[in-house]
Amino acid sequence: MKLRNDLRNIAIIAHVDHGKTTLVDQLLHQAGTFRANEQVAERAMDSNDLERERGITILAKNTAINYKDTRINILDTPGHADFGGEVERIMKMVDGVVLVVDAYEGCMPQTRFVLKKALEQNLNPVVVVNKIDRDFARPEEVIDEVLDLFIELDANEEQLEFPVVYASAINGTASLDPKQQDENMEALYETIIKHVPAPVDNAEEPLQFQVALLDYNDYVGRIGIGRVFRGTMKVGQQVSLMKLDGTAKSFRVTKIFGFQGLKRVEIEEAKAGDLVAVSGMEDINVGETVCPVDHQDPLPVLRIDEPTLQMTFVVNNSPFAGREGKYVTARKIEERLQSQLQTDVSLRVEPTASPDAWVVSGRGELHLSILIENMRREGYELQVSKPEVIIKEIDGVRCEPVERVQIDVPEEHTGSVMESMGARKGEMVDMINNGNGQVRLIFTVPSRGLIGYSTEFLSLTRGFGILNHTFDSYQPMQAGQVGGRRQGVLVSMENGKATSYGIQGIEDRGVIFVEPGTEVYEGMIVGEHNRDNDLVVNVSKMKQQTNVRSATKDQTTTIKKARIMSLEESLEYLNEDEYCEVTPESIRLRKKILNKNEREKAAKKKKTAGLS
C-alpha cells in the first residue's frame, strides 16, 4: 500500500483550559509559520471574540505547518461536549490525535468525552502531559489515570501503547523525560511524525471527498471543508454531490483552498489525504460526498449527536422593546437563526403556532447561550424561555438525558454537595480523596437536575468547588420534579427608575438584582424573595419631600450591592412562567404575564385545570 509520507493529519483534543490552543500556537511559531515581523495574537487559533474572552474553543479550526519534509495538518477542536458535533466530524478527517492532559488536574469529564470519540474511530493517540512546570504537577499519576481511562473506554492493545510527551506549552518546551525539558517542541513534532500513520496515497483512483465542516463567505457562498479520501480534485472539475437523501446534484468546483498557518491559500488541485475547503455548491451539507459524475460512490453518512436541550426564542414584546437593539422584528430573528443553521449542524430551529416564536434545540446550555450572546453582540433583541431537556421515547419508554458530573471540592463541603446532588436525583459513581484536603466526587445526574445548579453549587462550596459535566446517555425518566429554583422572586409593580430609597425598603425581603437608576417596568424581576412565593414590590418609590427634608437626602441612603447575573446565570435562574429579555445593552428577567392581576387569573385557571 502506497503512503503519503510527506503528510500527517492530526486533531488536538483536550478538556477545556488544559492548554490545547496555546500548544498549537507554539507549534505554529516554532515551525516558522509566521514572519519575524508579523504581529500574532496570543491564542491565535481562537478567532472568535467569545473564544478569546472565555478561553474556550467553540469552532473547530484548521491549520497546517511544515516541519522538515513533512506537512502536518492540525485541527484544533472544541473541548466542551456542547460542541461535540464538531469533535465527532473532525475524528473522521484525521489519522491520529494528540490528547492534551493537565499535569495537575489529570483526566476530566471532557477529556473522557473527546477521547471516547477518538477511540471509536480507531485513532491512536499521542498523549501530551501539559503544564509540567505547574506547582504540584503529578505527571506519573496523571499517566496512570489516562491509562485507566483508556481501559475503561475499551481501547485496543495498539491504542494502549500510547507514546507520552511532557510539555510546557506556555514556555514552548517539550521532552520525553518528565524530569527535564528540552529547549523547544522538537520532541512533539518527532513523536507525531513517528506515531501518527501517513495517509494512503490513492490519488489515481476515482474521487471521494467528504464534507465535515461548513463555512460561509459573502464572495464565494457556502464552503465545504473536508478530506479527500480518494483520488484527486481539481478547480473547474465537473463533479457530483451525493446528497444525504440519496439524490445527486452536479456542480463545478470553482475554488479549492488549502491551509497554511492560519491562512487559507487557493490551490489548483487536492490529492488523497489533503484537508481542503471547496466552493461551488450553494446547498452543500455536512456528511455529503463529492464524487466524479461517472463514478457515484458516497461514503457512509457522518453521525451527529442529537440535541438534548431546547429553549423558545421569542420576539421582544416588553415595554422596553426596540430601545436598545438594531434587529428586533420576527423576520430579522428568523433570518439570523436560519443563517446559523448554515454552519451549526448540531442546532435545530422549529416554528411554533406563533409567528413570533421558535423552538431552538442544541447540545446544552453553553451551546445555546453562545448563540444568544453572539446575537446580542450583533445588535439583536429577543426573549428566551427556561431551558428544557428533550425527552425521547426509546423502545416505548420515555427517556431523558443523563450527565456525568465531576466535582472537586474541599473536604468540609462534601456532605452538603452530596446532599444537594441527592435532591437532584444524582447517583454517586466514585469518590476519590486526594489526601491534600480536596475530594473528587463523580455522579450521574439527569440533565434537568443540573439546570440552575451552578449558582447553588457556588454558594454551597463558597466558591471553592469546581463543577464539570458532560452528556453521558439517555436513560429511563425518573419520576417527580428534579431540581429547579426553590425561591420566589421580587417583581416590580410599576414602570419607573429604581431608587436607593425604594431598594432599601425591600432589602430585608431578599436579594436585589437592580442598582439605583436602573429603569424597570411592571412585571420585571428585580430580586429574589426570601420565601418560596413571588412578591410584588415598588423599587422606584421616592422619599416624600417636606418643608423640613428634601428628596436629595435620598443620596445618603446606604444599600447592599446588587447581584448582577451573567447571561448563563440568568438562563439557569428562569422558571416556566418567566422570560430572559436579551438586548445589546441589557439582560433582564421578567414574568411572561406582566400584570399582577392577569398572572393571578392565569394561575387560578391552571390550578382549576389540574395542571399545577
Curated annotation (Swiss-Prot):
GTP binds at D17, H18, G19, K20, T21, T22, N130, K131, I132, D133. Gene3D superfamilies: 3.30.70.240, bipa protein, Elongation Factor G (Translational Gtpase), domain 3, P-loop containing nucleotide triphosphate hydrolases, Translation factors. Disruption phenotype: No visible growth phenotype at 15 degrees Celsius. One of its GO terms (biological process) is ribosomal large subunit assembly. It catalyses: GTP + H2O = GDP + phosphate + H(+). One of its GO terms (molecular function) is GTPase activity. It comes from the Bacteria. Its main location: cytoplasm. It is an enzyme of class 3 (hydrolase). GO terms for cellular component: cytosol; ribonucleoprotein complex. Keywords: Cytoplasm, GTP-binding, Hydrolase, Nucleotide-binding, Ribosome biogenesis, RNA-binding, rRNA-binding, tRNA-binding. Its EC number is 3.6.5.-. NCBIfam families: small_GTP, TypA_BipA. A 50S ribosomal subunit assembly protein with GTPase activity, required for 50S subunit assembly at low temperatures, may also play a role in translation. Binds GTP and analogs. Binds the 70S ribosome between the 30S and 50S subunits, in a similar position as ribosome-bound EF-G; it contacts a number of ribosomal proteins, both rRNAs and the A-site tRNA. Belongs to the TRAFAC class translation factor GTPase superfamily. Classic translation factor GTPase family. BipA subfamily. This is Large ribosomal subunit assembly factor BipA. It comes from Bacillus subtilis (strain 168).
